[in-house]
């Protein structure tokens, strides 16, 4: 389904001969729960792999993950499923450091500054220590830089590269 990046455009798109909005209304009447679009994630890649954690039924669970990849489709499916499980478990903030909001980085740095001051470090020591902690935080918080839970000797990016694919994006939704 390739239609655009606004909720209204997606609702008007056709899926299996019906509009997405109609499919949603049918699901509401079948399940008995009101549902609305709250978030929209646009992913670009040749292959998009899905994973539902703690699935109650097919496609329904507490955590849903989509991973977009480029490269050989079979290899992308295989590594994509593992990466999706990793995302469900680790809940990264962004794909890369560039995707982490500046206010999040500033807030983390403030925490490190506070910790260093509590430990009685000098002003120069506070700045030096907090500046070393921010890159560590970014490495642990971004998907491609995280240690891969399925092989902790490698990062997610290294594992994808070895599989001959590139991870171009992901979306994680939890209820």
Predicted segments, located by residue:
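N-terminal assembly/interaction segments in proteins that build large macromolecular machines
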Residues: 1-175
């Amino acid at each position: 389904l390739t239609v655009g990046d606004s909720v209204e455009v997606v609702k008007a798109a056709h899926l299996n001969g019906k509009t997405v909005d109609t499919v949603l209304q049918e699901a509401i009447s079948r399940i008995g729960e009101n549902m609305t679009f709250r978030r929209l994630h646009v992913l670009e890649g040749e292959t998009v792999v899905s994973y539902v954690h703690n699935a109650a039924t097919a496609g329904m669970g507490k955590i849903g993950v989509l991973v977009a990849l480029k490269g050989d489709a079979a290899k992308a499916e295989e590594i994509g499923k593992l990466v999706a499980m990793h995302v469900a478990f680790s809940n990264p903030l962004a794909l890369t450091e560039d995707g982490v909001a500046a206010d999040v980085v500033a807030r983390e740095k403030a925490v490190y500054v506070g910790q260093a001051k509590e430990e009685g470090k000098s002003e120069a020591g506070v700045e030096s220590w907090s500046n070393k902690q921010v890159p560590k935080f970014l490495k642990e918080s971004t998907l491609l830089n995280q240690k891969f839970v399925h092989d902790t000797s490698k990062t997610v990016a290294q594992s994808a590269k070895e599989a001959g694919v590139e991870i171009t994006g992901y979306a994680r939704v939890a209820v």
